[in-house]
Amino acid sequence: MRKLIFIIAGVLTLTSCKSEFKDNSDRFKVGVFEIPAGKGFVKETIIRKDSIQISQHGDHVDTLSIKWKNSFFYTLKYINPKTALQEDPMYVQINKIHNDSYDFTVKIGFSKFTQKATVHKVK
């Protein structure tokens, strides 16, 4: 009988607890973002709306389609590729979310090339 009371108390405790974690990872699907300049590349400004991403880096402006698989994985593809490399999709995995930024890893096509960086939400 005593064992049954402990089991019931445990079940009630576990089911009555409210999670304090709020998943608002969707906040990175639209807005204005920035990737700071780093070793070998210039600052990049990104504008995301619906299924389009406009990327400005240096004097170059590119338009990409963006397809979200879930809140932590999306695919980018150049709408008007200028090189053979730009014809391959880019697979982006969000690794860690911060207040207004996230760390990600990008893989180009089916190559072994990966790059890690951080995106900051500006607006």
Residue ranges and their predicted role:
Residues 18-20:
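Bacterial signal peptide processing site
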Residues 25-40:
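Tryptophan-anchored aromatic micro-motifs
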Residues 41-69:
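N-terminal glycine/threonine-rich, aromatic-flanked beta-hairpin/loop signature
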Residues 44-46, 63-67, 89-96, 117-121:
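Hydrophobic/aromatic beta-strand elements that line small-molecule binding cavities or substrate pockets
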